[in-house]
Each structure stands twice: as structure tokens, then as C-alpha cells.
């Protein structure tokens, strides 16, 4: 169900600024970054059918860390109704610790804001699954975006992609209506980013050692 204007107004008054926060690993892999970019545009476009100025946050910083960067990220996460996580093994890897912190923070916010609901505020989209998944991810029904890797950028022009974007937006709308029912407040002044990532149980794939001279000498 689209977010009615009255609900949109109440959520804005409660301190919510973004309809969703896109969480992804900043990597040279174009499947990951391209998916995040396309989702930002597609979600915003779909929401624009019922909302005058939909807002979707995606961090485009090339340099991570620092108090100012962390504050911007924290405020954007806190003032978002939902989080769309672009998942692949690299997203769970300890090298991208902030992905796990973003997940843990939004999970904590949802627990506080959506008491008694059988869903949270995180919407995982999976471009490559890992086996096993971290427990925090395995507990949530994810949306399969693996065709991004086999079809390439042309996938973003397919009916299948459009259907999945609509499914994401429907979940965002469901979360928005629930937040309104619970009279949730953003209450960002008291938000602390968790110290522990949500993916402590993740087992990264073993990485082969780089070839040394002895491997190819005859």
C-alpha cells in the first residue's frame, strides 16, 4: 500500500528524512556498486508514483573514516525508514566492517521502533550468496538479485528487475505504515553505532596465496 500523505507528514515530523538507506561494500566490483546505484534510482522512481519527493540515501564517499563521515552516516541511517543491503560475500567480510555495523545499528533501531512486528527494517538483496550466511542475514527473507552477475547491466531493463524493485518498495511501504502505527520517533540524538558488527559469525572463504616464483618455474 502506498504511503498516504498524512503518514508521510507524520513520519517527517517524527524526524525521518529518508525512505531507505542503501548499504553496500565500497569495492572495485561493478556488480556491487552498479547494483547500489541502480537501486537508488529505481526505488526513488517507484516511490515517486505516490510521494512528491522521495529520498534514498547512498553513501558515495571514496574516503572512509573520520568523525564527520561517521556522523553523516549515523544521521542518515537513523533518519531512514528502512535499509536495503546489497549482499555478497564481500559485504560480510571483516574488511568491510562498517557494513556489519550499519546492519547491527538498523536491526537495533527496528527492535526499538517496531515492537511486536514479525518483520524488521532491513531488506537484503543478494547478488551472490555465501554458504553459510551470517545468522543475522539467514533470518531474513532476501530478494534474489543474482542475475545481475550472469545477465549484466541489461538485467536492469528486464521485467524481473522491475518486479523485484516493486517488491522492495512494497516492503518499504509496509515498514513506513508500521512505524506510523507505533508512533515511532527517529530520536537520533541518542543513537550510538554498535561496537560489534552483525557478522561476527561469518566465515570468509579461504583465500589462495598469491603465486610465488616457485609456482611457475620449470
Where are these regions (language model features)?
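Conserved BB-loop
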Residues: 39-74, 89-98, 148, 155-156
Amino acid at each position: 500500500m502506498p504511503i498516504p500523505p498524512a503518514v508521510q507528514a507524520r513520519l517527517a515530523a517524527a524526524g525521518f528524512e529518508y525512505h531507505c538507506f542503501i548499504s553496500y561494500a565500497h569495492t572495485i566490483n561493478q556488480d556491487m556498486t552498479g547494483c547500489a546505484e541502480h537501486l537508488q534510482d529505481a526505488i526513488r522512481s517507484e516511490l515517486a508514483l505516490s510521494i512528491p519527493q522521495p529520498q534514498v540515501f547512498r553513501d558515495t564517499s571514496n574516503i572512509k573514516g573520520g568523525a564527520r563521515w561517521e556522523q553523516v552516516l549515523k544521521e542518515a541511517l537513523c533518519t531512514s525508514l528502512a535499509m536495503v543491503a546489497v549482499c555478497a560475500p564481500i559485504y560480510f567480510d571483516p574488511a568491510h566492517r562498517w557494513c556489519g555495523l550499519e546492519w547491527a545499528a538498523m536491526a537495533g533501531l527496528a527492535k526499538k521502533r517496531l515492537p511486536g512486528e514479525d518483520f524488521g527494517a532491513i531488506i537484503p538483496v543478494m547478488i551472490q550468496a555465501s554458504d553459510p550466511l551470517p545468522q543475522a542475514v539467514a533470518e531474513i527473507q532476501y530478494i534474489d538479485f543474482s542475475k545481475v552477475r550472469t545477465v549484466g547491466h541489461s538485467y536492469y531493463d528486464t521485467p524481473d528487475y522491475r518486479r523485484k524493485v516493486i517488491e522492495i518498495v512494497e516492503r518499504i511501504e509496509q515498514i513506513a505504515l508500521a512505524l506510523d502505527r507505533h508512533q515511532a520517533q527517529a530520536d537520533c540524538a541518542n543513537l550510538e553505532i554498535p561496537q560489534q558488527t552483525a557478522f561476527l559469525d561469518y566465515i570468509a572463504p579461504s583465500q589462495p596465496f598469491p603465486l610465488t616464483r616457485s609456482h611457475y618455474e620449470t
